[in-house]
Amino acid sequence: MNSYIYKEEDWEIVETLKSNVFKVNNKNNIVLNGNSFKTCILKIIINKDKNVWKEGQVLEKLKNIDSIVKCYGWCCNKHTTYIFIEYINGYTLEEYVLKNHPIPEKELSEIIEDLIKSLASIHEIGVIHRDLKLENVMFDKESNKWKLIDFGLSFSFSPSNDGSKCYTQCGSIGYIPPEIKLGGQCGRKSDIWIFGCLVIKMLGGELEETEIQIDGASFNNNNNKPNIWIPKIPPHASKFLQNFIQKCFFEEEVLRFDSITLIDHPFLSLFKSKGNMLYLIQRGHKRWMDITQKKKGIKIEGKTFTFEDNDNKEPFGPGIVPDGTVELIFKKTFNQRLIPGSIPSTVQILDFGVDGDSFFNQEMDDDLFLDCDLKSLTLGNAFTHTLPYFGSLCYLSLGRNRNALQNLPPTLETLKYYGEVQTDLNIKSIPHVKNLLIPFNNHSIIIDTIPPTVKYLAWGKLKDLEAIETLKNLPPSVNDLTFSCPPDVFDKIQRKHIPDSISIIIINQHVIELKNSDNSETYLKDNIVC
């Protein structure tokens, strides 16, 4: 807090911006916290609770980020708090959109990149904005930067937390994320939903709302739950931009992309460095699966134990893995027999090698995991035994064992299988899968065999044009699609073969730009990005 005592005669009101917010001149050259300035924004807040100067405290925390509006200081008396904020000579993003609509996507990508980097910076420090909208973004003509302003609804918390303990419902109509409407916790991912709404407004779209479902249950007034809505993405947005926005709108907060992952989204590279888009897409998928499914809400800092490769053939017994271990990693050559008590009950993530590359092939008895609440399991190609049933498993990576797709729990959200599926998938056994990776499966896609929750599908080879035409059997939930095909088949694939729900597609390791065009006869080979 500043030692300055507010005096009305020190300030000349130049303009009333909104209720109790003014542009003022510093008549007597008051210096606040070493800050000299001629003009500023003065916010006057009637003291009703102990957090009336919260915005000043938050801005002080963010003072070293040059894309955030500065706070010069604040002071209080018995009834009122006065906050002195940097005056930005420029215009709001709302004004810019109204004047320049439609904004070319190249320029949109530059603005979006600036803003998502600003958001990542405040999230890293431990601040959520909670009121991102066009009028709360300003272009500063002096610094030539877009800046986030108005942190009046912001919340500050420990950067080590995934979210905050802020349960208050606030924000602008149409921007409010599902978790807040449901009375839940507000965190970093809430800002991501709101950011997606902001991008829609940048496109000139309206926040028209369409009912969605969460965990298969429709929320409406008939079951005493708040209405849950997802904004409609303007159809004129390019497919890459649509995909960016889709990543902001996962209904379940933990599954939503975070600001760091969004910085690497291919839409932001489309106009400057197309050559690395394949790498960015693949890295983004892996990071998303690792953070949101493999390590979903699990605190592993200082609780990881890696067992190095060795030639020991003796059984792997109790006492080797430290008590309290949460993430247990065996290197790929490990193939000792595990005996009851060797896996601590605290283990939630268990890896044998990396995605198919492991020598481990010992039977895993149920007794081995009696007290474990395993959430993630990775097994390699060598594993040939029946998979035990793990009722809480969210992430499962399996080698090419043909019998391994048994005992799958309904809790699975990521399923990686490096064999060839011999029978149709039973979608009822995996009703919540978001990521389905079966890259060595060489069959056509049969209707009703891909769960309607899948967002990312990595298929194997579609051997001919007839198989390509089975892409129409994909559920509309699939946004990201990867598959391979013979070169002569690739040359024949047209835009009409790809479902409209697909916004990112990789074929034979080529990133293809799906044009928004009425010309369904366009060949995909003519739109290779990299």
Curated annotation (Swiss-Prot):
Cofactors required: Mg(2+)
Annotated Pfam families: FNIP, Pkinase
Protein's recorded name: Probable serine/threonine-protein kinase fnkB
Entry-linked Gene3D superfamilies: Transferase(Phosphotransferase) domain 1
Entry-linked SMART domains: S_TKc
Domain Protein kinase: 11-268
Keywords assigned: ATP-binding, Kinase, Magnesium, Metal-binding, Nucleotide-binding, Repeat, Serine/threonine-protein kinase, Transferase
